Structures are given as structure tokens and as C-alpha cells.
Amino acid sequence: MTMITDSLAVVLQRRDWENPGVTQLNRLAAHPPFASWRNSEEARTDRPSQQLRSLNGEWRFAWFPAPEAVPESWLECDLPDADTVVVPSNWQMHGYDAPIYTNVTYPITVNPPFVPAENPTGCYSLTFNIDESWLQEGQTRIIFDGVNSAFHLWCNGRWVGYGQDSRLPSEFDLSAFLRAGENRLAVMVLRWSDGSYLEDQDMWRMSGIFRDVSLLHKPTTQISDFQVTTLFNDDFSRAVLEAEVQMYGELRDELRVTVSLWQGETQVASGTAPFGGEIIDERGGYADRVTLRLNVENPELWSAEIPNLYRAVVELHTADGTLIEAEACDVGFREVRIENGLLLLNGKPLLIRGVNRHEHHPLHGQVMDEQTMVQDILLMKQNNFNAVRCSHYPNHPLWYTLCDRYGLYVVDEANIETHGMVPMNRLTDDPRWLPAMSERVTRMVQRDRNHPSVIIWSLGNESGHGANHDALYRWIKSVDPSRPVQYEGGGADTTATDIICPMYARVDEDQPFPAVPKWSIKKWLSLPGEMRPLILCEYAHAMGNSLGGFAKYWQAFRQYPRLQGGFVWDWVDQSLIKYDENGNPWSAYGGDFGDTPNDRQFCMNGLVFADRTPHPALTEAKHQQQYFQFRLSGRTIEVTSEYLFRHSDNEFLHWMVALDGKPLASGEVPLDVGPQGKQLIELPELPQPESAGQLWLTVRVVQPNATAWSEAGHISAWQQWRLAENLSVTLPSASHAIPQLTTSGTDFCIELGNKRWQFNRQSGFLSQMWIGDEKQLLTPLRDQFTRAPLDNDIGVSEATRIDPNAWVERWKAAGHYQAEAALLQCTADTLADAVLITTAHAWQHQGKTLFISRKTYRIDGHGEMVINVDVAVASDTPHPARIGLTCQLAQVSERVNWLGLGPQENYPDRLTAACFDRWDLPLSDMYTPYVFPSENGLRCGTRELNYGPHQWRGDFQFNISRYSQQQLMETSHRHLLHAEEGTWLNIDGFHMGIGGDDSWSPSVSAEFQLSAGRYHYQLVWCQK
């Protein structure tokens, strides 16, 4: 044990937090989570241990701007102005200091290992009583599961130790410091330490004791470590559970270890042995270790599909059977290996349906509770995710247990990122930083290696590639050859990774960056000598309205076996709740706390909002990742299962044929499909529709019974086919009414019954409509070529740094947002049964014509206005965001009804999950409340739209809400939006894709850009 004086002054003088060679003082060795049961039955059933006591709750807290400001007296007693805070928590969430959001740039001046003199310091204290029996025998430990970023610990005024690495436990022996009755802990937490240079992850930078604190009492002679490994024969019919157990304390001949394996109430296998291992070298073997091997016949294998778990109980006892203590863990029999370029689980090639997940809560910062963890897992499972990458640090210990039990594959990642270094590997190639990096990797492995859900180790994130990585890669491969290691830094295919694991590599497009090129994922597989599997560690940047082009990745994954999936970036928006002057909550992002530097809304890349409400893009991910694929041939549906291990035992295929959303026939068939099997389903002869419209066949896989992760009736997969379009049209009855045209100096006015249309002759726009005496328009009907920029349109542009390649900057520079209409033509003609208005506009900026829009409006005796639009696009202007029409309707109706793709928001490059049907939703549901306002709510493939008294028909895309594109563009946060008068309607003949391969470079694929020179579309607008 390291001994230093107890005084605060000496601790401050040592400045351990600015020495990369000091990562801990007196911290105990890493190991799996312990509970020290004194009853083996309680260990088997995982009951709360009487030897494990939580110290979570209210602690006294005082905040100081620097450690030097902390008074020495605090070590002995609470300060008079101390506050009370809840542990675990981040102190920034209690109003102390400010959270800082930055992606790459370090939040402190880069001068490793030194940190600013102004180093916010939180002083925690807790008074507690100790059970006297704990003082009489054994060892009492204190466990801090997570403290950011470094801390010193005192107990009863005496210095205990020091720890850093904010995402792994720091555990200390308190036995020599405790006394009968009342005891006092004092914890001095520093916001910045040399460890902060290894923790430059894209996240909020927060501080404090943010994970659980507990006391653990272990006997003097104790289990100090245990590791379980599962081994198999070739066909997995026989397995061996290998358990290596290490003890600490007096090594006596009478000591024995028994390992028993349980499946529920049934003991499957058991073995007992004394300590003493195999001979290692000429000096012998480990006297304090023993390895037991238990044979298991026909084990029920673990996978994310079927997370079969056993329970291993490790008992330390004497020869006569007297139990000293027991530890236990869940065991999943599974094998992970790479063979012939494929990542295999239990001999089957995996397809990773993965997502990156930060530990984030909008109210609690980086504090994770069980309810939130379970909620995340259930949502992932319900949306066909099977894997999660712990980005970019080891998670709360409970997370892994939950992943074991619910079934998720886990990439466990070391808490190492040096993204802001220049070059990135400045520290990771420096041997002075090897000890700090080593502790972060080795302690992660030692804590988490017993979890079957952990199938891959990761050396960290975005830290370049240095010699330290190579050393740690070799250490893991030596200590745990049962799992592959991945690491993206330095080019994604270095010697420190078993898996090619690029981030944001595209399907077909190379990105030839200097030194670290990102090849297309298809090309990467074919590079000379390359035989590793490729799994994208990050892809499909889900920032705001994004995930365009996601289907293209999944087409490639299914086409090329060695393209084994990837991890979407990322799971949850990292917005935080703030309150306005009236106490109303709102969602904040970088800069909203006065934090500098900051990267604004770049913290919000989630498939779900911070409160776990899904983004529309989540449905697209669910659909592309679904485990059932469908093919239609005639009246035969072929259903293929992509499950590797699971037989469909809780699925029905529901099918329905509908004409323009009206059901004509339906049925339900039980699915009986084995792993990777097929089932043919023959549909009956379908009825012939009697009216015109689109005929669609929709199939849905429905789970009739609830599961551990879904409710009864859960839909896990679906597909639609357009069968035909019935052209047996009933002609409208002839109208004897003829619209009347009147012309004034300023307007053309058309009147039919109680309806009137007014076209302004100076502007050429439809300026007003009346039904009776009620005006229908608040603004004229005008062309629209722009959209409120998406995050993907903005890229890295900001006020102080313009990216001229970003779509929004190209549109601005070309004048798309500033363009004004010059009237070229506005004429009116009376036809035999209609009035025809003809207009032409040149949309110009600074004398340059960007678009020419020619329209005809034909108003007939039925009151239908047929609008034909022809648009010519200048050859030297950027491809526009949309080609359509917009106006502000006077009407505000509660509901919107449409025949088209839905129900969720969809865009041309993100619509495979949408279904063609007749949908009816509240107006409020047509707006997607992205925290950073942008273009949103589009519905594609629309044939008919009904809103209030109005109906539009054609083949178009639309969005409708209380917010104008102008307001969306000018507003920084959704809570600042105000409902405008009336309703804004945007009807597009064409709309550009949204992209999403990444959010910092133009990522809309060419096929989803509006690159043609001419466009035509038609609408029918009438009143019902």
C-alpha cells in the first residue's frame, strides 16, 4: 500500500492528476463484479447480498473553482455552506459549473499532461455507520463504479487512495480506516486530469460521482478473481465450462473451490478442487489459482436471438464443506471466432444489426438507472437491433448483465480517445502514456470478460494508431484468445484489429484521404491480401432528419458475405433539459450553457430523442434490419428467415390486398420457418377491383404472444408490393356550369357557384380563393425550390467557419434562398367548359435566372383546378432541394388525411419502411419535433391529400404544419417555434434526398439529387 501523509496540502503538492505515470494509488486489482454471498443458494438465484451495501443517496457537497481553494478543515468536517446532492449524479446537473459539449476540440488548453489551474473541484462527504461484525473480521472495500475525472479519497480524516479513468471502478480497502459507530468519507473530485487527454469523446464533458458507490465486505481469505470460458467440440454437442479461480489470503491445505453450473433449479455439472495450478515454467505454477473443467452435454447455446443462460456458482470452502464465500455469474455457452474471413458465432456468420450508444439521460446527464437501460434494450430489440457498441467507454456494470439476459451482442470499448491531438496518435505512440492506456484496456477486460454478450473488445476510438495499440492488442489476444479485437484508428485495417472496422465508409464511393484513405466497403474487401471481415464501427450518421441511403448499405450487406453489418451512429440524442424563466423545460445542446468551446447541435445524432421517443428514421432501420425477407411470384410469397438459431414459434404472416387503402381481401398464416429456412405461402385467388386505383399487397409478421422484449401483437417485419393499377375509370358527369372569368386592372377572377379564384396579374400568382365569403389563403401559391436546411445540408458550416461545399452554402451562394420571381407571362382564356390561366416566372438572383417556371391552371365546371407545372433549371446552379409549390392556408383543421406513403415521415432516399395506404393523423403528428428545427414531415408517393375543405390529387410529396420553412430556418431550438396563423402547405413534384452517410460532407447519392434540367408535375386542387 502506498503511504503518504493525510494532509490535503501534501496531496495538492503531489499533483497526481498531472502525471500520466500515476493512474491510481492503493486501488485494488480489477475483477468481475463481486457480491461475496455467504449462502450458495442466494448466489445461485442472484438475491441481494447482505455483504454488499449501497452508499447511493444524499451526500454533502461543496464546489470550488480549483483544488487549492479547498480548506484543509474539510477533511475532518463538513463546511458550513455545503449543499446536499444525490449520488450518483453529475454536479453540472445540479447547477455547479457548466456542462461542455465538444466533439473533437479539447475543452482545455492542450498541454499534456498538464491541466488548467482553474480546475473545478467537487468535495463530497458522507457520514455512515458500519456493522461491527464487519470490523471484527474480513476486509471492507469501497467501490466507486464511476468518477469523472480523478479523485482522492479520505476516510475519517486519513488519506486512502487515488483513482482515475472515469468509466471503470476504483476500489479501495477501507479496513484499516474504519471504526466502530460513525465514519466519514471525504472525496475530492477534480474535473480535469491528465486522464482527460485520453477521454476526448464526442459527448458532454461532465464531472462528479456519476455511478454507484457501495461497500463490500469480504472474508480475510477470499475469492479475488474468477474467469469462465466455454469450449466446444466441432458440432457444439458437447461443451466444457472452464473456470479459473484465484484466491487471496492465507493459503491453507484445507481450502477448496467448488464450481457448480445451474440451469434454473437444475444442477448441470459440478467440480471441486484444491488450489494449485498447472506448471507454468521452471519455477512451477500458481499456488493461489485453480482451474476446473466441467463437461456439459448438449448445451443450450447463447445468442442474441435465444439468450440461454446458465448460472455458475463459485464457492470457496474448507475441506469439510464450510462455506467461506461464494461468487457467481451468468454463463452463456457460445463461441466467437473469425474463420475464412467471417465473424462466426456458434459456427454461423453474424450479420451485425448494430448501434452506437452513449450513456445519456436528458435530466440526469451521464447517470444511468436500470429503467433507462432496460428501456434502451427493449427499443433496440423491438427495432431489430442485435448489437450495441459501448461508445466510447466501458458502460455501467449492469448494462452487460442486461445484454446477457435480453440478448444483445456487445462491443466493449476502452475509455481511450485522443481525437483532438495533432496528430491523433501523439499520445498513443508515446511510451510515457502506455501505463495509462494499459490500465484502461486491461481493467476493462478483467471486469467484463465473463459476459457472453461481449463478443468483441475494442481498443478505443479515434486515437490514431500507435505502438501502444499494438502492445495492448497483443496483450488481449494473449489473455483472452476467445474474442476478436477491433480498432478503427489509423485507417481501420491496421495490425491492431482483427476486423476491418471503418467509420462512414460508403458503399461504392472511395474517399481517398491522405494517409488514411476510406475505401468503399465493397472495394475494401477486395484489396490484395485482405481476408478480414468488414463491420462498420460507425455508419449512417443519424443527425436530425437523416438516414437517407440506409437501404443501400443493407443491400450490400446481404450481397457480400464478408460485409457483416455495422453500428449506426448513434442511439440517443444527447440533449439536456433546461428550464426557462417560467419553469418550462426545453432541450438544450452545445453552447446553451455558455460552454466554450462547443459544437452546437452535433450532440444530437440519435435514432431516438433524448427521452427515447423514436425518430422517424428508427422505423427505416427496423425495416432494413428485419429478420424476415419476402419475395412475391404470382400468388406465392416466399418468406426467408435470417435468424441463425431461432425457429419461428411466435409469428403469423398477415396479408392484405387493398385498393387505394380499401381492404379487398386478407388472411393470416402461421409461420413455420427454421433458422435460415424458407416457407412458401400460396394466396387465394384475389378479387378483381371494380373501381380505379392502385392495388397493393401488404404482408406483416405479427407476434401474437408477448416476449421478454415485446408486447403481444408486435410487428417485426413487413413488405409491400404494388400489384397493378386498375384503369377502369368512371368518367365524371358532364357539368352544365361554366366558370365565369372577369378581368380587372390587377386581377383575373374566376367564379363558379360559391367558389372564387383570384390571380394577381402583376405577380402572376394565385393570390386568393374563396368558399362563400371565407378566404382560403393567407399567402399566394408560389414556387418553392428550397428547404429549411437539414443538419446534413449544413455540414460543418457555422457562423465562424463556412464550408463552401455544404449544400446550404451552395444554395445561399447561388441565391436560391434569395431568389425573386420576375413575371414573364400571365394570361387568361375562356375555353368551352373551363377557364385557363397561363403564367411564366423567371426566378432570379442578382440578375441571374436560376429557374423558369411555367404553369397552367385549368378551372372547370366541377370546380377542379388542374395545375400543370414545367420547371427549367439553370445548368450552372446547384441542384435544388425541391421543386414544388407552397402557400399558407387560412384553414386550421385537427386532422390530415392522405393516400400515399406513411404513416411516418419519409423522404425519397428513406422510404422503404413506409407503406402505401390511406392514413389519417392529427395535424400535430405531421411535424417532427427535431430539437434543431429543419425541413421535416415529408410524405412521399402521395396520390390524394385531404385537409379541411380542400383536396389535392396527383403524384406528389407534401408536408403540412403550423411552421413555415422560413421560421424553421431562422429558429435555433424547437421550443422557440411558434404556431403561425393558418397552416403551411408544401406540395412538391420532386424533393431531393436527405443523405446520411455522414453529416459533414454532401452525402445525398446522385440518384436522389435533382440533377435534371427540366421537370414536370401535375396537381388537381378542388374543394370537397
Swiss-Prot record:
Mitochondrion keyword on record: no
Key words of the record: Glycosidase, Hydrolase, Magnesium, Metal-binding, Sodium
PROSITE patterns: GLYCOSYL_HYDROL_F2_1, GLYCOSYL_HYDROL_F2_2
E.C. number(s) listed in UniProt: 3.2.1.23
Binding site for substrate: 103, 202, 462, 538-541, 605, 1000
Residue ranges of the TM segments: none
Binding site for Mg(2+) 1: 417, 419, 462
Residues at which Na(+) binds: 202, 602, 605
Binding residues for Mg(2+) 2: 598
One Gene Ontology CC term in the entry: beta-galactosidase complex
Keyword Kinase: no
Catalytic function, reaction form: Hydrolysis of terminal non-reducing beta-D-galactose residues in beta-D-galactosides
Comment on bound cofactor: Binds 2 magnesium ions per monomer.
GO MF term set: beta-galactosidase activity; carbohydrate binding; magnesium ion binding
Cofactor(s), names only, from the UniProt record: Mg(2+); Na(+)
Residues at the site labelled Transition state stabilizer: 358, 392
UniProt family annotation: Belongs to the glycosyl hydrolase 2 family.
Protein name: Beta-galactosidase
Organism: Escherichia coli O6:H1 (strain CFT073 / ATCC 700928 / UPEC)
Lineage: Bacteria, Pseudomonadati, Pseudomonadota, Gammaproteobacteria, Enterobacterales
